[in-house]
Amino acid sequence: MELGKGKLLRTGLNALHQAVHPIHGLAWTDGNQVVLTDLRLHSGEVKFGDSKVIGQFECVCGLSWAPPVADDTPVLLAVQHEKHVTVWQLCPSPMESSKWLTSQTCEIRGSLPILPQGCVWHPKCAILTVLTAQDVSIFPNVHSDDSQVKADINTQGRIHCACWTQDGLRLVVAVGSSLHSYIWDSAQKTLHRCSSCLVFDVDSHVCSITATVDSQVAIATELPLDKICGLNASETFNIPPNSKDMTPYALPVIGEVRSMDKEATDSETNSEVSVSSSYLEPLDLTHIHFNQHKSEGNSLICLRKKDYLTGTGQDSSHLVLVTFKKAVTMTRKVTIPGILVPDLIAFNLKAHVVAVASNTCNIILIYSVIPSSVPNIQQIRLENTERPKGICFLTDQLLLILVGKQKLTDTTFLPSSKSDQYAISLIVREIMLEEEPSITSGESQTTYSTFSAPLNKANRKKLIESLSPDFCHQNKGLLLTVNTSSQNGRPGRTLIKEIQSPLSSICDGSIALDAEPVTQPASLPRHSSTPDHTSTLEPPRLPQRKNLQSEKETYQLSKEVEILSRNLVEMQRCLSELTNRLHNGKKSSSVYPLSQDLPYVHIIYQKPYYLGPVVEKRAVLLCDGKLRLSTVQQTFGLSLIEMLHDSHWILLSADSEGFIPLTFTATQEIIIRDGSLSRSDVFRDSFSHSPGAVSSLKVFTGLAAPSLDTTGCCNHVDGMA
């Protein structure tokens, strides 16, 4: 559904957080107007109704509904402006039942700007929490006044986000890379710090947070670019420890059991601060020493790099589940590939799935957080110019996405404002997570302790590369790595380079991620009497991955047989042509065109989905407007070829001379695919592309394909693609 154009924040925004009301529908803004759009679920489908403007302001940054408490109480809507928040109540009109009267109940002003997700309602009552970069204020009486209760934030860090737990007893505030917990006393209307879990550090800055079940929260941490850049800048130096503290560095371990009680708070916090500060402090070059080994006796200066991040999992953004009970426990931690700053997060309580996205990336990832199963992932990919500006679950299977489409701008200069103009629309995507075989409770904890070992970074890379030789050349993404040493020992590899991301599943379905263990009982059963560092256990039940591997091997074998058969057919054709020429005499050679007027066609090959959503394009020379079928077969490694004409796929054949019995025109675009594979299992339903941007071709369901009048190919022109 198209909503029109509007001015939205570039980053940090989730315009659909607490924006859907069961009666009044969706509240959204274009930057100035407050609009209500009717939203209904009918037979499992979303139906959008009429929209009406209920207010207009100079600047609106966000909207959020208070939780519905009772039928006889007015409905509250918080309107977030740049530096203040106004709370409005909606009451039914006594004159017309279809109309609603709005009136302002209170206005909250502050000296600092409100954070992009700075209005958070209590899950069970009309208590509003307002966040700035330095303050957290709770307003328990928004129906009548602006009386507030301030949280005691005794830290110098910057507040990013906050949320209430589902039980409504605890407020969790993300300050920098740490979580601060507060207990709410509803009777006294007071907020005090939790004595059993004061501060819990998660190693990286928290971008977004949401409540999951009971006293558990899910947080998304950004990629620690400051640590990686700090490491890369000093990678050739061996920096000694601080002279004041000669103890070895305390390096965090991702798979380590992370828990915090009252006694261990100070010691654990101090040990990790010493690590993070080593990447942020300026380097003292006057104390740089070099180590000289026996094998380096002839070297003048030997400087050794110290890599603290590679292999620890800190070179990626993460989704972390944190449980607050008697002690804080990190119950699970998985990587978020391809997204640098995951500032959008949403949770569905019924399906136990989390959606993670970013305002600056067109990818949305769906994770399963069920404790007894391996977390799955589903990828939702938007257009290149589209960005998710808000996400929320309507049901356990439907995800509502507010999409902002940006016009193409010059990326040479950084944007000068925090907001930009977008073409706003609403889309609904179905969540289809494949269920993994259930794991018993006795096996689940053991699974967490062993699953990260076989699926660490190196093994996962080998597994992905084994699926297809071209798998790493498919979906574009960003990979940031701090491992800058090559096999020949020369440092200096690019820190950030564009690769083809392996994050998408082979069939846009679900693949199992590596779950890094964080909580284990003290008495876990041993699978072997050998030490831990020598035991290697297989990952638990990966039928989909094994099926894909066997399917890939079968596909490669069949392709090799087809190539041999095609070569034999080509040899027979050449022998037959030579025989005919000997009997009938040489044919007069045709006049060839000038190289300046090169006649060629663009052949676009749509590959099967389990090789990745990839479109390969080649430029092929025409011979008198004709294409030789064998040339096309050899170019793309196909035995049977289907060509798209209007909305139909047509199998191509050859005449007695080996040419496709059609005439083609220069610079014509031809779309082909493998004709020997099953349509229902392998290919998408349809194919669409833009005439001016063939490089951004993608496959979509239900879109009509462009028409072609002719096709053909002969000698291949290298370098034209």
From Swiss-Prot:
Where on the chain is N-acetylmethionine found, per UniProt? M1
Which regions form coiled coils? 556-584
- Supply the alphabetized keyword list: Acetylation, Chromosomal rearrangement, Coiled coil, Phosphoprotein, Repeat, WD repeat
Per the UniProt entry, what is one GO biological process?
protein complex oligomerization
Post-translationally, this protein is described as follows, namely: Phosphorylated on Tyr when associated with HCK.
Q: Name one Pfam family in it.
A: WDCP
Region Disordered: start-end pairs:
520-553
Protein name listed in UniProt: WD repeat and coiled-coil-containing protein
- What is the source species? Homo sapiens
